Amino acid sequence: MATRSTIMDTNSFRPEMAAALDPETRKLTEERDVLGPAYRLFYRNPVHLVKGRGSHLWDADGEEYLDVYNNVASVGHCHPRVVDALTQQASMLNTHTRYLHENILHYAEDILSTMPDELDRIMFQCTGSEANDLAIRVAQTYTGGEGVIVTSEAYHGNSALTSKLSPALGTAQTLGLTMRMIPTPDTYRLVIDGKPAAECAAEEFGNWMAGEVRKAVADMERHGIKFAALLADSIFSSDGVYPDPVGYLKPVID
């Protein structure tokens, strides 16, 4: 069994750190008691953010930060086109998919035009947790299997299903019995057949990862578990964000 990840634990603020904080920051951290324990606060000295524009953030003291972390605002904070579109739609109509509406159809068509022909349907979800949850359930229904493979530092969501597939949540989270972990495709540290992974061609690196997947599938089969899916984001963001060679996932998929 692979070692459980503690990435989230390592980055988290803990109550015993409060004594070193200024009074205002300490007060805000104490007031977070109204939030559930799954809400994590980062850093020994938590950042109190009040404004964002583009790739920059500002805290309550006016200190400016370059945001190279946040995964929420993928087109930049407060992008004027996004703000304008949200404002216009919120001022006109906010409802669900049980009624006819052109916008959802046009949006779906735009997205599908960028996808392979095999992906010809869309089911919109509100969060990544829900999207991954649905993807796994689709894979399990299609294959008739239950087994899911993830990388050793992966985070895939907070739902009942995806949290059991997220080693990055740390030791407080029980992992699924039908889940298997493979090593993170770390081009900085891995050595493959005596050669640093960073020097490997895409096919060579992909063959290594495909071998790790095959070993995980074989272990599932030894325990009577049928393989259903490999769940991964292509940059392995929770694992560390690795610049792996373009096309390396093809041998894994094949």
Predicted regions and their residues:
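A generic structural signal for short coil/turn motifs at secondary-structure boundaries
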Residues: 74-76, 95-96, 189-192, 238-242
